[in-house]
Amino acid sequence: MGGSCAQRRRAGPRQVLFPLLLPFFYPTLCEPIRYSIPEELAKGSVVGNLAKDLGLSVLDVSARKLRVSAEKLHFSVDAESGDLLVKNRIDREQICKERRRCELQLEAVVENPLNIFHVIVVIEDVNDHAPQFDKKEIHLEIFESASAGTRLSLDPATDPDININSIKDYKINSNPYFSLMVRVNSDGGKYPELSLEKLLDREEQRSHSLILTALDGGDPPRSATAHIEISVKDTNDNPPVFSRDEYRISLSENLPPGSPVLQVTATDQDEGVNAEINYYFRSTAQSTKHMFSLDEKTGMIKNNQSFDFEDVERYTMEVEAKDGGGLSTQCKVIIEILDENDNSPEIIITSLSDQILENSPPGMVVALFKTRDLDFGGNGEVRCNIETDIPFKIYSSSNHYYKLVTDGALDREQTPEYNVTIVATDRGKPPLSSSRSITLYVADINDNAPVFDQTSYVVHVAENNPPGASIAQVSASDPDLGLNGHISYSIVASDLEPLAVSSYVSVSAQSGVVFAQRAFDHEQLRAFALTLQARDHGSPTLSANVSLRVLVGDRNDNAPRVLYPALGPDGSAFFDMVPRSAEPGYLVTKVVAVDADSGHNAWLSYHVLQASEPGLFSLGLRTGEVRTARALGDRDAARQRLLVAVRDGGQPPLSATATLHLVFADNLQEILPDLSDRPVLSDPQAELQFYLVVALALISVLFLLAVILAIALRLRRSLSPTTWDCFHPGLCVKSGPVVPPNYSEGTLPYSYNLCIAHTGTKEFNFLKCSVPLHSNEDMVCSVSPGALIPPHGGEDLTSHPETLTSQAPPNTDWRFSQAQRPGTSGSQNGDDTGTWPNNQFDTEMLQAMILASASEAADGSSTLGGGAGTMGLSARYGPQFTLQHVPDYRQNVYIPGSNATLTNAAGKRDGKAPAGGNGNKKKSGKKEKK
């Protein structure tokens, strides 16, 4: 039924070498596949096996989605066999109208790869229409004077069928006067005419009736009949004559309706009524009669409607001129319509990909489309283009067919979709154009790894946090879509190994929130680092890592711990012995405490809560040093007790207490007989209550206090100045031991810690100083020489040298040298007031020495001075010895039983006397005994 390029391709031996390349070049190398079918085929009739003619197997029909497309779809493809089937009624006369060659053009589309083939179906005419006369009754007139051979034109019948199925012949019934002649024009049209065979006699027969039959060439033939009535009239011997037998004119299709088109003219040599000519359309299609109008008197032809070259290119009509005597003649009028560029091109999308992967290579076909312009010639030639700033371009695959292909890399994250506007422009003057926009969606692939908001994270978490609390949150973003952009978080590494990371922290896979699995302890874990990973769910998965450093902040959760004084092995408290001759400022002992916290939470301060003799001792706020605030008086007990509180700097502060037992004696033998008779000291809480009662009583006797004050003022005026000086409030005692001038200074080789039971019945008697101390702060002496000074001013110091007691400065053997000072470098002067350490190194040095001092004080193994119970520091606890876990404390180093501070032992080994503070040092000539 039809030929195909595929069949010819298989026939060529050389083309077999390139079976895979032929589908790409098929549209340009082969002629269209042609089929020929008769019209009016039933629906479902097989036109041909399109798959076979394309060289496709039965499996390829569905796999490659073989289909056809056209403006009016009259055909379809069987999805199983690949047959081209009739889908709708095919009427050649309706589809092609008056065209003799009727063809339907289709496009066969296949995918994988995407391609298109041209198919032409020729519609063959069948004899489905019978001839038809415009008028069933034909009336003619003829003069009786008409000679034999006169011809009368008859209206021909019409048949929409073509070729052999069109009108083939005409017949009339037999009669003696007329015969039928068929005239064939140059275009093949057949026109019947009656020929007069013999003269007429109107008087004999005034009219003649004939039957005209039109036959087509079909098998079987179809026919139509018309009744002819001929009236015989009087003589009119000259018929009209046209100036031309054929009129031809060309008109623009843009000619407005009502415009004059053509005027036909005919002349008649007769006179009178026989010369009056009227014009009529004859043998003209009804569509032509609707398009044009003819003035019967003038012969002027005008258009009733606008022309459209795309619908009808040429009009043909016959005009008859008839005179008043009934004679007539005909002429042919041909009107050709000239094409104007009045139709814009059309863009028809035949195939379009729904989505394009963003990793599609350049040259991938994403759409097929064709153009159509109903104009003719250059007006119908179309060229297409698109925007130049998009990664696509157009290829012309064949006449009026185009491919839209990729021309660069696609990135969905930057441009998720493209609105491609195709512009088609014809070559007319002026050119006309049209556009068609299509939307191309870019499908996502997993080409972007997650990205964290920060390059690293640092969070601060206070210790003792509740387990399960969130401590941080990391966030990452992924511009991909769906699973490619869905992020999960996890912990992949940490510096807690080999500890179980999961027992410390966890992370929410969905939100990135980091939770603490336990309460952190700053003293055990101050900081740790985690490596978090963000991973998407694409295939393959992509990930990114980020570091998270967690700093555990300190809280005041550890109370101070007193290292000295400590209880003995039997639970009894140690006693510190104080010489009876101790002057104000004498260093009695030192409270040493540590705090496991850090920072301000470990900044310790020392306070006296209770004292058996208030005002006798002073306590350094930061150093914890216990010094004599005044000289021992006659009424002061030999045994003294101090209750000291150690507070840290936290909020709220935590504290610890320590009890100091002090004994005034010059040697141990002096106090041993009386220790058993010493009454037991009252309970600290009871004494505190007692003082509260006394304070309340004092408030009630304010008047009595006023009297006492008046008596005191009177006594001041009556007593000698020397006696009053003991009560002078301006007395300042030099810090450090006061030694009478008949003694020489030197280092003590021994010191004592005396433990005395509470059942003693005796106590040491010391000389009490009547000078009260008006400050409970640390005593700092700057000018006092350690003796009673009259209140007359500094000039008495030079005028009465015999009243001054010379006192050597403290022995520097017990002081730190500059190189041995803990903390900062030796060139920097330390702060003697207990200020906070400047750096971690200072803290570690002090912590090491404090622990060493405390350890030796506890076990009585002091090596400094050689005496048992001395909390001295040996050379191994110098500044180079560090302990990382001991908290920071400065100045809390004390040597019990001594009024000296640490010194460099090197000077002692070299036999050099330490330099005194004021140059009045005497060499010791005596050796102290225990």
Curated annotation (Swiss-Prot):
Q: What Gene Ontology terms describe where this protein resides (cellular component)?
A: plasma membrane
Entry's transmembrane regions: 692-712
Q: Which residues face the membrane's Cytoplasmic side?
A: 713-930
Extracellular topological domain: 31-691
State which residues carry a glycan (glycosylated).
N304, N419, N545
SMART domains reported for this sequence: CA (SM00112)
Which part of the chain is the Cadherin domain? 31-133, 134-242, 243-347, 348-452, 453-562, 570-675
Q: Which UniProt keywords apply?
A: Calcium, Cell adhesion, Cell membrane, Glycoprotein, Membrane, Repeat, Signal, Transmembrane, Transmembrane helix
- Locate the region Disordered: 791-839, 900-930
- Compositional bias segments (type: Basic residues): 920-930
Q: Where in the cell is it found?
A: Cell membrane
Locations of Polar residues compositional bias? 800-839
InterPro entries linked: Cadherin-like_dom, Cadherin-like_sf, Cadherin_C, Cadherin_CBD, Cadherin_CS, Cadherin_N, Protocadherin/Cadherin-CA
Please report the record's description of how this protein sits within the membrane: Single-pass type I membrane protein
List this protein's GO terms for biological process: homophilic cell adhesion via plasma membrane adhesion molecules; nervous system development
Q: Where does the UniProt annotation place the signal sequence?
A: 1-30
Role: Potential calcium-dependent cell-adhesion protein. May be involved in the establishment and maintenance of specific neuronal connections in the brain.
Protein name, entry field: Protocadherin gamma-B6
